[in-house]
Amino acid sequence: ISGSLGISNMYFWRGQDISNGGAQVFGSLDYSHSSGLYAGVWGSSETDTTEYDLYVGYGGALGDLSYDLSYISYNYPNDTESDLQEVILSLGYAGFSAAGYFGVGDYGHGSDSTDNKDNYFTVGYSYDKYSVLVGTWDRDEDDTNYTHVDLGYALTDNLSFTGSKIVDADDGSEG
């Protein structure tokens, strides 16, 4: 069993600041087994609402190839229409990584939709203290698809910096 506690100047998720520039306090409580099975809860404070996430997964390695399959439920007690769930598959090899986040279950974002078909994909590379990640969100709900590039630098194991830029966006409008 392990835990974490942190503070951030914003809630940075999938290339966007979703906290409207507000500082965040976050923490987790995790259980992991030597077999590769793990589960946990993560939570954050936000000014308008609180979020807690529940997750379970299994990860391991076959030689130099790492793999992970997990399920996560994002929960917003004060805004249940924004709750969503995803199945995540990730692979890594020699500093390279790739992941797919596949929307399942109920979904809201303030709409009447209950069918989450949103998908998010990433490819990345890390070397020493530097990292680059390209993420693409394919949103079914309102066609606000976008691609972002993140550049990161880890000053220490506990302090890192990430810059992100949305490089391609489709706001769903015609024309």
Model-assigned labels for residue ranges:
Residues 1-175:
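Outer-membrane beta-barrel proteins
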